[in-house]
Amino acid sequence: RLVGSEMCIRDRYCRDEGLRKYWDEYSYPYHKNGEGNNSFRSAMTNKVQKKVDARAYNHNQDSFTIENVIRWFDYWRERPGTGDRVSSGGVKIIFSDTNTHYRGVENYRRSGVTDAMRIPKDPFYAHQVMWDGWVDIENPRIHIVGHWNYKEDVVKPVYVVSSAEKVELFLNGKSLGNGQRDYHFLYTFKDVAFVPGKLEAVGYDKNGKECCRAELQTAGKPEQIKLSVIQSPKGWKADGADMVLLQVEVMDKDGRRCPLANDLIHFDVEGPAEWRGGIAQGKDNYILSKDLPVECGINRALIRSLTTPGTVRITAKADGLQSAEISLSSAPVEVKNGLSNYIPGDELEGRLTRGETPLTPSYKDTKVDVNILSAVAGANQDEAIKSFDDNELSEWKNDGRLNSAWIT
């Protein structure tokens, strides 16, 4: 469409999908990139289509992150400051709130950089790295893809997403060298042998000064359950509709999340609330069930308030793990003659942490387009203009001879 006198094109740049549960092919549940059946349920017709190439919808987190970096790089390299025809930006939307259609082997959607419970996947953190600036990168960031809990004999590539100019990897304080840089943001360290401990990635700027750092630590055996609550900053309201997210994690004895834990957690709820449950890989996706497995050591469930305020106590138990308990309270809302004027959205504040739009330029010109005035061709000179006339339907051709196959 036209905006003023300029052409504006909107496009979807990455529709691939990946289950959050699938780290990589080197750790549980050992999912190779693209592995799965060749079918998907169409969002348009709601029919299952067989014998289609569904590999793009069956990523693991390693390959899903890499794909997101590659696809965004296609637009980032054409950002403002790189000529007259540029990408003006991007926004990340997801389709993870449905279990009525799917693509790939699972029977619910795995689209987007978070799952349906808004638990981040690795591409979420990759986008934090790539999008930390109005146009040009302003704040260098770094993220190590995956986890650091493997069997002793595993040798695997380690991927790091960073906006630094150089990235060095350290394992228990020993340097493993600098990563191979591709697509500006992706650094690959090939054939890294697993050793328990601390894996660190350090980013350096163009002057060789450290500008960002990230680390992964090997977690111990699963020992305990941890519960926490995510709710509105204004509190949980007893209006019969307000909901909170209950987060459950499996931790080691030192309080580190166990990235390979998939324990089945049983929940008990006491008090004025309705259990709405979460979602996980399985025949029925555990919809509404009070038995819910963690995936990669974490999951979430929704709890809805009733119209009666009060204290709600939730207990979580699992075989072989120390149980956990948490209490939360819902606050009353004013009701007159059976009606309430309370609208939850009225209390939500916009997130303005990014700050005001800058008044000064947010990018530097790195490339300037120059208009072509004329061209000289080895043949068919009268059609040489077709090589730069901005018409995709026209083209210049030579006369079929090698010695005339040139144009300047």
Regions found by a protein language model. Give the residues of each.
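Short, small-residue-biased leader/transition segments that mark boundaries at the very start
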Residues: 2-9
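Substrate-binding clefts and catalytic carboxylate motifs of secreted carbohydrate-active enzymes
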Residues: 10-240, 253-258
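A structural signal for short, hydrophobic beta-strand segments that form beta-sheets
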Residues: 144, 272-276, 372
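Short, surface-exposed loop/turn motifs at beta-strand boundaries within globular domains
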Residues: 153, 162, 241-243, 381, ...
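Short, solvent-exposed beta-strand edge segments and adjacent coil->beta transition regions
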Residues: 155, 298, 404-406
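Core sequence-specific DNA-binding domains of diverse transcription factors
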Residues: 158-159, 169, 174-362
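Disordered, acidic Ser/Thr/Pro-rich linker "stalks" and the adjacent N-terminal cap
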Residues: 347-408
